[in-house]
Regions:
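Extracellular/surface-exposed low-complexity segments
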Residues: 1-25
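Intrinsically disordered, low-complexity regions of eukaryotic proteins
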Residues: 8, 15, 45, 58-62, ...
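Short, well-ordered beta-strand segments enriched in hydrophobic/aromatic residues
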Residues: 29-33
C-alpha cells in the first residue's frame, strides 16, 4: 500500500466504493460513491454477472414450513447521486432488467459510462419508463447492447444519435417490442 496525498491510499477506486442502495419504503434504488459502502448496500456488477439488486431474494420459510418464493426487489425510482459522477462502472448489464414499475431515473447525467463494455438488457422490460435520456452516454467501449431497450413500451422517443457503436458486437433485439 502506498500513500496518496488526496485520499490516503492507492486502490482501484482511489479508496472510494461505488455501490447501490435500495430503500424499500420508497422503492428507490440510489447509486452512490463514497469512502465506505454501507451495510446492506450492493456492489456494482462486472461483465455478464447479474447485479445483486436484480437477483431473486432467497426463498423464505414460514412457520408451517411453506416456502415463500424468492422475489426481486420492486424498483419504482432510480437516483444517480452526484457522488456517483466520479464512479467508473465497467458493466451496466441488467441494471434495470424487468423493473416493470420503474417510472423515473433522476440524475442520469451522473452515470459516467466511458469504461462500460456491457449495456445488454440494461433497460429491458421497463414497461412504464418515460422519459429516458441516454444522449450523454459514452458508448465508445461498449461491445454488447443486446436487448438494451426491449419492451420499453412507454418510451415515446429515444435519442441515440451520439452512440458510438464501432466496438459493438451484439445489438440483437436492441429495440424489440418498443412502440
Amino acid at each position: 500500500t502506498y500513500a496518496n496525498y488526496e485520499n490516503g491510499y492507492f486502490s482501484p477506486e482511489g479508496g472510494f466504493h461505488a455501490y447501490a442502495e435500495f430503500n424499500e419504503g420508497t422503492g428507490t434504488l440510489t447509486f452512490r460513491r463514497g469512502l465506505s459502502k454501507p451495510a446492506g448496500a450492493y456492489d456494482l456488477n462486472e461483465g455478464n454477472a447479474t447485479p445483486e439488486w436484480r437477483k431473486e431474494k432467497e426463498p423464505e420459510h414460514n412457520n408451517d414450513e411453506f416456502i415463500v418464493p424468492g422475489v426481486k426487489i420492486d424498483i419504482s425510482n432510480v437516483v444517480f447521486d452526484a457522488s456517483f459522477a466520479n464512479a467508473r462502472p465497467t458493466s451496466c448489464y441488467k441494471w434495470f432488467d424487468m423493473c416493470t414499475s420503474l417510472t423515473e431515473i433522476e440524475g442520469i447525467e451522473n452515470l459516467n459510462t466511458e469504461k462500460v463494455t456491457n449495456m445488454g438488457s440494461m433497460f429491458s422490460g421497463c414497461h412504464v419508463l418515460n422519459p429516458l435520456d441516454v444522449s450523454n452516454f459514452d458508448t465508445q467501449n461498449v461491445e454488447d447492447m443486446s436487448e438494451m431497450f426491449v419492451s420499453c413500451m412507454k418510451l415515446k422517443s429515444l435519442n441515440v444519435s451520439n452512440f458510438d457503436t464501432q466496438k459493438v458486437k451484439n445489438m440483437s433485439s436492441m429495440f424489440y417490442n418498443c412502440n
